[in-house]
Amino acid sequence: MSETSSAPVRRPFHRRRKTCPFSGANAPRIDYKDVRLLQRYISERGKIVPSRITAVSQKKQRELAQAIKRARFLGLLPYVVA
């Protein structure tokens, strides 16, 4: 008695790789004074969102983190959100 499944074999799900929002022709520049842009990359608790969620490249993630920290130091962004 051989066991055969009636369900077809499923192909593994392949998620399309996200592209960096800061690379490209008309991509926004990372600037510590651009608070509206920086707030998109901060969680509701005030933490910097990791690049695996935002799909920012490694180089641009470092620039983004530096800009967020600089804006926090100057008082443009809060360190923590209550």
From Swiss-Prot:
It comes from Rhizobium leguminosarum bv. trifolii (strain WSM2304). Binds as a heterodimer with protein bS6 to the central domain of the 16S rRNA, where it helps stabilize the platform of the 30S subunit. Part of the 30S ribosomal subunit. Forms a tight heterodimer with protein bS6. Gene3D superfamilies: Ribosomal protein S18 (4.10.640.10). HAMAP family: Ribosomal_bS18. The keyword Ribonucleoprotein applies. InterPro entries: Ribosomal_bS18 (IPR001648), Ribosomal_bS18_CS (IPR018275), Ribosomal_bS18_sf (IPR036870). Belongs to the bacterial ribosomal protein bS18 family. One of its GO terms (molecular function) is structural constituent of ribosome. The gene is rpsR. Residues 1-20 are annotated as: Disordered. Keywords: Ribonucleoprotein, Ribosomal protein, RNA-binding, rRNA-binding. Pfam families: Ribosomal_S18. One of its GO terms (cellular component) is cytosolic small ribosomal subunit. This is Small ribosomal subunit protein bS18. Disulfide bonds: none annotated. The keyword RNA-binding applies. Transmembrane segments: none annotated. One of its GO terms (biological process) is translation.
